Amino acid sequence: MVYYDLNIDSSLPEPKIKSMLSLHTKYGYDSVAITHTVEGKIGYKDVCKIKKIQIEDDSEKSTSSGWMKMGDSNKTIKQYTRLQVICKTMAEFQMITANNPVVQSYDIISVVPYDVSVFNAACNSNEIDIITIDTFSKFIIKPERVRQCIAKGIFIEILYGNLFGIDADRIAFFQIASSLVRSSFGKNIILSSSGKSSTTLRSPYDLSNLGHLFGLTFDQAKAAVSKHPHTAVLHAITRRTKGIATVTDPNLLKDLELWKLERKEDTQPTNNNIPHEKHINKESTGKETIPKPTTTTTTTTTTTTTAKTKTPTPTPTTEKTPSIPTQPPQKPTAKSNKKTTTNTTSTAQKQGKMDIDIDNNKRKRE
């Protein structure tokens, strides 16, 4: 288990900071944040100037259990830099942007709101990691804003160092802590010392018992000094590092790579410059021609012919001279079905008249 204390005042003398780091190591803390506090608008004079403190005493070794006893672990305490801005107006809060070089020079960014409008804006901000609730924050904390803060991944810090001050600060601490626990159900709560005196520092197990006094369970109070601060540090790293990361199933990745290879084979040219036979004109070799589309038109014509027949006229003769019978007219050849159906009745009548005339001529000759 890794324990954190994310609030140690950087304005203290260096020997005192070094003694406090040694005490943190004895209590089992693994990481701390040295905080630079700015009241009002931040400027170029507030660029990070915090240097890493070297602990020379080798006898001060950290404990893995969090109790105040000497251990055999040789791990050194990790130090982060933190900027804490006390904002009373929205103009001061709007100075905290990702493009500000002062903000970029620190590892962790936190805000101490003294106005409800600043607190509401901080709960919906992407530029900060921690909201510190101080006893000077004289406003009502709404549960909706706290849940919005949790959804954004922002953590709310409570400074337990106010318990060792005057009675008014102690009462204000329990009121604020109880309302935050009721609103957040114990989520995204961080417990930190004020970092101004070694007498106010407590071990992680003492803070776990302290959490019971304002509504936290043992696991939630333990997470307030281990899991939640660790997540806040990761949130700060992701805020500073802008990029895109994808997580895929290995089996799905194999299928995707195979699909890319197949797609590459389909789209890669084959360096074949010889055209296909259907695109080559046989008469003119070497020239590629596009076959022209052929259209066929069918026309149907119907012709109608009228059969002209000469009716025989009798010639008056005094002598009996044989008359040459007229040949019957040839039947017209109908080229269409309509002609054959319309002329069948007329030809039959004309043929009957011609037969009667021939019989009359034979009788006259006799």
Curated annotation (Swiss-Prot):
Query: GO MF annotations for this entry?
Result: ribonuclease P activity; ribonuclease P RNA binding; RNA binding; tRNA binding
Catalytic activity reported: Endonucleolytic cleavage of RNA, removing 5'-extranucleotides from tRNA precursor
Signal sequence segment:
none
Which Enzyme Commission numbers does its entry carry?
Answer: 3.1.26.5
Q: What is its main location?
A: nucleus
Q: List the disulfide bonds.
A: none
Q: Which SUPFAM superfamilies match?
A: PHP domain-like (SSF89550)
Among InterPro entries, the record links this protein to: Pol/histidinol_Pase-like, RNase_P_p30
Question: Looking at its record, which EC class is this enzyme?
Answer: hydrolase
> Biased-composition ranges for Low complexity?
291-324, 333-351
What keywords sit in the KW lines?
Hydrolase, Nucleus, tRNA processing
Q: GO CC terms on record?
A: nucleolar ribonuclease P complex; ribonuclease MRP complex
Record carries keyword Hydrolase:
yes
Q: Which Pfam families match?
A: RNase_P_p30
Name the family the entry cites: Belongs to the eukaryotic/archaeal RNase P protein component 3 family.
Outline what the protein does. Answer: Component of ribonuclease P, a protein complex that generates mature tRNA molecules by cleaving their 5'-ends.
Q: Which PANTHER family match?
A: RIBONUCLEASE P PROTEIN SUBUNIT P30 (PTHR13031:SF0), RIBONUCLEASE P SUBUNIT P30 (PTHR13031)
- Protein name, as recorded: Ribonuclease P protein subunit drpp30
Q: Which organism is it from?
A: Dictyostelium discoideum
Gene assigned in the entry: drpp30
